[in-house]
């Protein structure tokens, strides 16, 4: 189960299972050997940039909206950090409006504009309780920057909605070099920034999906994904 406040339990989460199946079918979630930003060799890779047509993006927005509505989190508007978060925020705002909840949204530019309306923020004025929407939380940098912008505008960041929680230990730099932390990037955001984190699905959900597969082409990946979780998971 993938809800606000934690990575979930072993109970089956139908929304998460449907999302994992969708991501696999869309080619967004792939299996093989992939090098992560932390330098680890991961047996799977999630690339939200491959939700690259109207149908895929619309369905992705449905998953976000359903998870957010079920979360119980109260929020007044949506914020999408540049760059991937911009499209996600717009798509989710459209889907929520379709479901009867019309909320404002905003996003930031990475380059401050010095003409026209100027500034780095675009869209509705930030106000009230703001939920941040992104694809994943890798190091928490984007979330920290978003929190600073939202607070500087006088609004309150209240949570982060993401597509996938990898549930793996973050890395941290010490005087002896880079080492694995005892927490994930999502846990850092929860503990240090005080924000609820909502994931449509988690690594636990992916493992459940693989364990249920009758297709050997998919089931064969379960041992490697489980071994990765055993080594780097939280």
From Swiss-Prot:
Annotated Gene3D superfamilies: 3.40.50.2020
Keywords carried by this UniProt record: Glycosyltransferase, Magnesium, Pyrimidine biosynthesis, Transferase
Keyword Magnesium in annotation: yes
Annotated positions binding orotate: 45-46, 138, 166
Listed GO MF terms: magnesium ion binding; orotate phosphoribosyltransferase activity
Region forming the signal peptide: none
Domain of life: Bacteria
EC assignment: 2.4.2.10
InterPro entries in alphabetical order: OPRT, Or_phspho_trans_dom, PRibTrfase_dom, PRTase-like
Catalytic activity line of the entry: orotidine 5'-phosphate + diphosphate = orotate + 5-phospho-alpha-D-ribose 1-diphosphate
Pathway stated in the Swiss-Prot or TrEMBL entry: Pyrimidine metabolism; UMP biosynthesis via de novo pathway; UMP from orotate: step 1/2
GO biological process: 'de novo' pyrimidine nucleobase biosynthetic process; 'de novo' UMP biosynthetic process; pyrimidine ribonucleoside biosynthetic process
Known cofactor(s): Mg(2+)
A GO CC annotation given for this chain: cytoplasm
Name of the protein described by the UniProt record: Orotate phosphoribosyltransferase
Subunit (UniProt): Homodimer.
Family the entry assigns: Belongs to the purine/pyrimidine phosphoribosyltransferase family. PyrE subfamily.
Pfam families: Pribosyltran
Binding site for 5-phospho-alpha-D-ribose 1-diphosphate: 37, 83-84, 109-110, 113, 115, 134-142
Job description of the protein: Catalyzes the transfer of a ribosyl phosphate group from 5-phosphoribose 1-diphosphate to orotate, leading to the formation of orotidine monophosphate (OMP).
């Amino acid at each position: 189960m993938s809800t606000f406040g934690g990575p979930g339990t072993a109970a089956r989460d139908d929304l998460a299972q449907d999302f994992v199946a969708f991501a696999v079918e869309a080619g967004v979630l792939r299996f093989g050997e992939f090098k992560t930003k932390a330098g680890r060799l991961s047996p799977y890779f999630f690339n939200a940039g491959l939700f690259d047509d109207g149908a895929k993006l619309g369905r992705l927005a449905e998953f976000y909206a359903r998870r957010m509505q079920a979360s119980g989190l109260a929020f007044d508007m949506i914020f999408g950090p540049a760059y991937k978060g911009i499209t996600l925020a717009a798509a989710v705002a459209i889907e929520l409006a379709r479901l009867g909840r019309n909320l404002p949204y905003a996003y930031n530019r990475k380059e401050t504009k010095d003409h026209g309306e100027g500034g780095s923020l675009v869209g509705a004025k930030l106000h009230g309780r703001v939920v941040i929407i992104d694809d994943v939380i890798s190091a928490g940098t984007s979330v920290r920057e978003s929190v600073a912008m939202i607070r500087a505008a006088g609004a309150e960041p209240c949570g982060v909605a993401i597509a996938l929680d990898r549930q793996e230990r973050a890395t941290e730099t010490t005087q002896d070099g880079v080492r694995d932390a005892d927490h994930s990037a999502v846990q850092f955001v929860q503990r240090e920034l005080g924000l609820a984190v909502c994931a449509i699905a988690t690594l636990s959900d992916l493992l459940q999906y693989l364990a249920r597969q009758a297709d050997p082409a998919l089931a064969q990946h379960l041992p490697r994904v489980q071994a990765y979780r055993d080594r780097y998971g939280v």
